[in-house]
Amino acid sequence: MSYIWLIKKKKLKKHTKVYMDFFDYGEQDFVMCEMCQQDRAVDIHHLESRAMGGSKNKDYIENLMGLCRDCHNKAEADSMFNMFCKIKHLENVCHQIYAMIEYNKTMKRYENRK
């Protein structure tokens, strides 16, 4: 279990840090569940389970999704729901990448005006 909001004394787990850094969240930010967008995301779900074998490093952004407890339990139990989670998460990742590209373009235009 990876809590997104943490007591200051606790160290972020690697996969939580990867997720938080990519989406530019701070430790105190309210992070909504990527699926239901109703509850606070308290878990970072590995879309491809670490227990499924293959690469031992499953802590890359395409494989990490912020979910509330209910959605996380459902994703763990229901392979079809987990597939929908993968699709939704990849949409969110693509949107974030697009936003970063647009931000960089805007900053370059601003810098060129100087």
Name each region found by the language model.
Residues 41-42, 68:
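A composition/secondary-structure signal for short, hydrophobic, low-basic-content segments
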Residues 42-44, 77:
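Short, non-ligating residues that shape and space the ligands of small metal-coordination modules
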Residues 1-41, 52, 81-114:
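A boundary/linker detector
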Residues 44-45, 71:
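Single, functionally critical "micro-switch" positions that shape active/binding sites
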Residues 48-65:
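Short linker/helix segments within small regulatory modules
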